[in-house]
Design a protein with these regions (language model features):
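Active-site entrance/lid segments in N-terminal catalytic domains of soluble metabolic enzymes
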Residues: 1-231, 402, 406-429
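A structural signal for short, well-ordered beta-strand segments and their strand-loop junctions
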Residues: 45, 144, 238-239, 262
Length: 430
């Protein structure tokens, strides 16, 4: 029986553990979480979702307040065409965040940033180009292109001095999506350094329709590996979505030929995660029936989350002036639905109106009200111990990472704090 640590991931000659922690936004995969994994030689993601607002909270900047004030005149406008991000501010926020991160890196591991194309920010190509290049200029170890086909992303970076230096990868959910990306990126003369294949059991946005259950991670990994082999391409493939233990990771690698694993849900409840303790406890207490896939996101992608997510029962006025990360040509499905609801509410009983289909994802993600999780989140109770007061002991991120690497079969090592707690509370719930 093998442990994940007996395998290795080769990224352009650099040998690393075959495990990446996923980039969970907004600021769930915090800098502290990523740095704790990097310090032990691991691979960790941060997320670039809503970085101006993240910087405001971390560094006391005023990017969000400045944008809200500048765009205040359009608050009652039905379409937000003029509510644009200041590209200089976007660049400054990304630079500040990434520079702060990289200044504290040890160099033992690899720090990556997850960049979502679906954050169109009312000027998709301009803002995406700014975000990508600012991250490169600030010294990020690599960029994982997520939530979109990214048909233009390599072209947007090709003039950057670090275009061939930094590690660049992409998340796909089919060989078709990968083929489109490679064809459009070919003129740059650059191949991705790794490919993350995200299956239907992942948390958050899914790269499938509501027929997601018809797909499987092993089948897609094999499909992508065959696609690459047919074209003579040797690019590491990372399997993601639903891999809960080190033993499962080994099984996926051995059965599919994957070169590594990406995991996220177990890191969401780590001590260094940005989620509030109440959300982490909800994850630990979750049952299978609490985990749902819905159309709450205005991006058009299905999302997997806990049904207890506060956002699902809280329709808020669109905050496009302050945020507007999902605006595209001045509109988004939630903004449109809000306008229609307000029109229907004129002279009507609001309580009788149907519930909103979508949510203001910018606001709710920023406030940690969307509790996204993988399909196996109900197993989190296996990974720790519940205290007498009902709260759960949170593992350190490095403990989660090391357990993935070192555990064999179905075993899961308890956090050190949980082991100590059990010595004085042997009856504690696990």
């Amino acid at each position: 029986m093998s442990a994940l640590s007996s395998f290795a991931l080769n990224l352009r000659g650099r040998i690393l553990p075959p495990l990446m922690s996923g980039g969970m936004g907004t600021n769930i995969s915090t800098d502290r979480l990523a740095l704790s994994i990097e310090a032990i030689g691991g691979i960790a993601h941060v997320s670039d979702a809503e970085l101006p607002d993240v910087c405001d909270r971390m560094f006391g900047t005023r990017f969000t307040a400045t944008k809200a004030k500048r765009c205040a005149a359009g608050r009652d406008e039905p379409v937000k065409t003029d509510e644009l991000f200041d590209l200089a501010a976007v660049r400054e926020a990304t630079t500040r965040y990434v520079s702060s991160l990289m200044e504290r890196a040890t160099g033992r591991g690899l720090l990556l940033i997850n960049c979502m194309e679906k954050l169109t920010m009312n000027a998709g190509l301009d803002t995406l180009k700014t975000r990508l290049n600012a991250a490169l200029d600030a010294g990020i170890g690599g960029i994982t292109l997520a939530a979109g086909l990214h048909l233009s992303s390599f072209r947007l970076m090709e003039e950057n001095p670090r275009f061939h230096d930094a590690f660049l990868g992409i998340i796909v959910s089919s060989s078709r999506a990968l083929n489109l990306f490679l064809r459009k990126s070919a003129p740059t003369g650059r191949l991705p350094d790794y490919i993350v294949v995200e299956g239907p059991l992942a948390g958050g946005h899914l790269g499938f329709g509501m027929d997601w259950a018809k797909h499987s991670l092993p089948a897609i990994v094999r499909e992508v590996k065959a696609f690459l082999s047919e074209r003579g391409l040797s690019i590491p493939v990372i399997a993601a979505g639903g891999v809960f233990t080190g033993g499962e990771a080994v099984r996926v690698i051995e059965e599919t030929g994957a070169d590594g694993i990406q995991a996220a849900t177990r890191f969401a409840v780590a001590r260094e995660s940005g989620l509030p303790d109440a959300a982490k406890d909800a994850f630990f207490n979750a049952s299978d029936r609490d985990i749902v896939v819905n159309g709450f996101s205005p991006t058009g992608y299905p999302m997997r989350m806990l049904r207890q997510s506060p956002a699902l029962a809280n329709a808020v006025r669109p905050n496009c002036e302050a945020y507007g990360y999902l605006l595209n040509h001045g509109d988004c499905p939630y903004l449109k639905e809000w306008r229609e609801r307000e029109a229907a509410a004129a002279g009507a009983d609001r309580a009788a109106l149907p519930a909103m289909t979508h949510g203001c994802l910018c606001t709710h993600m920023r406030n940690f009200k969307v509790w996204t999780c993988g399909a196996n989140a109900s197993r989190l109770r296996e990974t720790s111990v519940q205290r007498e007061d009902g709260s759960w002991i949170q593992p350190e991120a490095r403990e989660v990472y090391e357990d993935y690497l070192m555990s064999e079969g179905e075993s899961i090592a308890l956090p050190r704090a949980a082991i100590e707690y059990l010595k004085s509370h042997p009856e504690a719930r696990r």
